[in-house]
Every structure is written in structure tokens, then in C-alpha cells.
């Protein structure tokens, strides 16, 4: 005769170990978020700590906890009660996440970091740099990689809108910022800290401080890839990124238009002055396929190849054209709705072309141990 399984506290904790805090990406059991476990016969009641009152992930955490507990063999009624951490508990959590670090540091500046960092740049605005950043990041996240985005375009921030996370502000735990996650991508932007569409009116030093905070004060976890969406041109932010994250590689975005390509070269030649590597060139808004199958080159053709060839000569290195992204209305449409085209319409021409570029970016970088971390601006 079969005996009924008696649920134990160990069973409950093992189940809860499958529940992650969505903002931190670690099991709630490892984060000391399980407040209590009470078992009465076959009924199970658990208490779970949230990092802050009004936690935006409360429904997700509660639902996931309830789901794993209801899968327990022989379980009866399941109840989940939510509590809020005290200031002392939040400090302990922040200390645990920082590990041996006594204060904020930029993990991506560590010579042993394995995170591949891409600074996405363009000579001028309007070439689709931010759209490329968001879709490349989302494409890699869809393949199972851990990906983040820093919206370093402080004045022209657009990442929250393109990711559909305008209404998701970051959670702050003892001065450590937990970035929102959308489509599997952690991302941070100054747009998450301002009211509505208010402009940012800052001078250079404030820009530098913002980038430092995004890199050091945000909990990124163990990222495979970090994208930094730079502002157009070669100003303060581009230099700041080169100095704070010297192993960042430049991804140059241009259009086929000759004038845009010429300006894009300037964004690429900053690599000579900062000793950065150029990962490649992306040509956006390439030919548009018409209903009859013909291709209309609305913005001309050859701009991407021109930039790649010219930068190869100027930097004495092999700078490849990683891909040409066709002019596809779906790319714009899904950008407006915050649903990147690579996941919302994966079979569209633009999505396929972007994934082909993403496939060339997903390898973790080599360690910079023993190499100079002080790029000079010549």
C-alpha cells in the first residue's frame, strides 16, 4: 500500500529555489527573501520578502512562488504572504550582491571581465543607432545570453520607449540600482528618472557622472554582452566611455547615403585616439524590397562598405561590414510600440538581417589581464 508523501520544509525551500527575483536574476532562497515556511498537514504557507514596498515585480514573484509550490506532491492549500524588507535587510542584500566590494565599482573595467562590451556609435542622429542597439540586445537575449543596455545618449534617450518599459522605473536597494528588464534585457536610462518628456539640461561633468553611475551603481549581474547606446558624434560621452570602459569595442551604424557614411567615419576614427577596437560597421536603411520584387535604394547604396573600407585604412585593422539592414516598415512600427522586431516579427527581412549581425557579436571576450587599462586621448 502506497504511503502519502509528507511535505517537509526542505521540499518547500527546494521548490522556492526555482523562483528568481526578476530584477536581480537570482533565486529568492539565495537572497534571504524567504521570510517563513509553515506546514499544516498538507497545507503550505510561505512568507516572502520584497525588496521595497510597492515592488513592481510583486505579482510575478507571488505567482511564480505559488506555481512551484502547487507542483509539490500531495500539497493541499497554498498561500503566499508578501512582506517588505527592513532597511537593515536591504543593506545586507546589497552587501551580498556586491560581494567583496566595499563600494560601487565598474565591473566592466576589470581586466578579467568576460563581458563583451559594444559601444554603438554613429556620426549623426537619425540613422537608427538606438533601434539597432535594442534589437541586437533582444536578439542575443532570445538566444539565452544575459544582456544589458546602458542608454548613454543622455540628451536623446530613447531606449525605454523602444523596449516598451516607459512605465518601469528602477528599484533602488541601499543605493544599488536594479535595472528594469524587458524582453529579457536589463537596461538603464536617464529617461527612467525624469518626469514625462522633460529635457535633460546638463553640462559635460554631469554627463560623465551619469555614465559612471550607470556602470557602477547598477546591479548588472554576470552579463555576457553589454551594449552602450552612445549619442551621435564624438563628444564628452564617447571619450568618457573610452576612459571608463577601455575594453569597449565600437559598433558603427550608418546608412547607405554618402553624406551619412562620411560623417560615420568620424565616429569610427575616434578609435585611433582612444586605442579602442572597432567591432564592425552596420548599414541600416539599406534597399527596400517593393511588392514586385525589385529593390529601391531610397538612401543610395554602398555607404556601409565605404565606411568599413575607410576605417580599415585609417586604423590599420580589419573593419568588416557586419551586415546591411533593409529599409523595413516593421522595424519602425515595432519600435514605436516597444516590441523589438526581432521577436515580434522574426521572419521579417529586418529581423533576419539583425539576427545575422547579432550572431557575429555573441562570443565572450578575451581577458585583458596584463594589458593597459588607461587609453590615451591623443
Predicted features and spans:
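Short edge beta-strands and adjacent turn/loop segments
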Residues: 22-49, 325
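Walker A/P-loop phosphate-binding motif and the immediately C-terminal alpha-helix
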Residues: 116-154, 268
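Residue-level signature of catalytic and energy-coupling elements of molecular machines
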Residues: 16, 34, 55, 69, ...
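Conserved catalytic-core segment of NTP-binding enzymes
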Residues: 93, 209, 217-220, 224-333
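C-terminal boundary of histidine-terminating zinc-finger modules
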Residues: 337-350
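Phosphate-binding loop that captures ATP/GTP phosphates
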Residues: 140-204, 208-215
